[in-house]
Amino acid sequence: MSEISQTVPELVAWARKNDFSISLPVDRLSFLLAVATLNGERLDGEMSEGELVDAFRHVSDAFEQTSETIGVRANNAINEMVRQRLLNRFTSEQAEGNAIYRLTPLGIGITDYYIRQREFSTLRLSMQLSIVAGELKRAADAAQEGGDEFHWHRNVYAPLKYSVAEIFDSIDLTQRIMDEQQQQVKDDIAQLLNKDWRAAISSCELLLSETSGTLRELQDTLEAAGDKLQANLLRIQDATMSHDDLHFVDRLVFDLQSKLDRIISWGQQSIDLWIGYDRHVHKFIRTAIDMDKNRVFAQRLRQSVQTYFDDPWALTYASADRLLDMRDEEMALRDDEVTGELPPDLEYEEFNEIREQLAAIIEEQLAIYKTRQTPLDLGLVVREYLAQYPRARHFDVARIVIDQAVRLGVAQADFTGLPAKWQPINDYGAKVQAHVIDKY
């Protein structure tokens, strides 16, 4: 856990005074990664200038750069790395011209982020949590034993500061890297769906399930150890309450508790957010399949784009929410069977407008039953209405008729507890079970 004691102006002045700057285009970053990879194979962690030039040559070939100026460009790249404090150069009078290079902590940090930290490992996380649990238990035991100031610094503060806090930071870094990986998965899924969503469904499913499993593994591992870690932190906190001179330990324990709570909380929140995204993708796929069963829409859109310069067109929409959610229950009069062109009379009408118009007409016609106090047989009335509409709209029209009818009154036969008879309402097997409405 880093502790920044300087103020912002002090840090700015320090960075300006030392002329800190980092500029890593993709070729320079690739060179740094190549150096780090080769450096990892050295037992002594040292590299000669010739080895750096060889690494630069590999990068130059990969980027298809000219090989005629390889020496000059490699020398410039090495000097730039040294100037940016990514490499340390060591020279001696005995070996003039044969400098030795070592990666700096900054260089190791950057390459470690891109190389080693990209892989999530449940075993690694379990080992980290096991080490933290052991350190916390020993620190809690030492805190309960008590002792002088040296005892508290050596056996309590030091393990918390330089072991527990750093591992917490490592776990936090793992979570942040997984945040980036989630965003990359989202970008990959978007590209797959934009190219050919039918062929991409299986790939999307694989990406979604793998990411969900990784997030769940991480959170389960954290939650399993979280209670024990918090318990030991509370033991240390209780031991410091009777000592007024241990504010530094108490403050560190509070920071660790906050860090642990934040790690576990964000882990669960990340899972919840991913579940929401998972549902969104599946909903999009289902909607696309339902809308375009026969690829009519896709074919028409492709033709429209291809013939745009011959027959220009413009797309205008008034309700973005309806375009995003085509499976809204409020959108009645959907044609689930036919995916071709709409009739000319309905082509430019909103679904809700049609529903409202139809509901108003049916409400006005059914009101006659209430005015005359005439019994309303739902089975007969619904059948009469459905005869006026095509089969594809029978369900929506029947629902509107029934909704308007039950607002007028109730059937006294409903209170007898006896079930009503099933009555056919169209010639395709649809039936309704309802008593005659006779009390308005």
Swiss-Prot record:
GO molecular function, one term: calcium ion binding
Localization (cell): Cytoplasm, Nucleoid
This protein's record includes keyword Disulfide bond: no
Domain of life of the organism encoding this protein: Bacteria
UniProt-annotated stretches for the region Leucine-zipper: 208-236
One of the protein's GO biological processes: cell division
Entries under HAMAP family matching the protein: MukF
Stated family: Belongs to the MukF family.
Quaternary structure note: Interacts, and probably forms a ternary complex, with MukE and MukB via its C-terminal region. The complex formation is stimulated by calcium or magnesium. It is required for an interaction between MukE and MukB.
Protein's UniProt name: Chromosome partition protein MukF
Taxonomic lineage from the root: Bacteria, Pseudomonadati, Pseudomonadota, Gammaproteobacteria, Enterobacterales
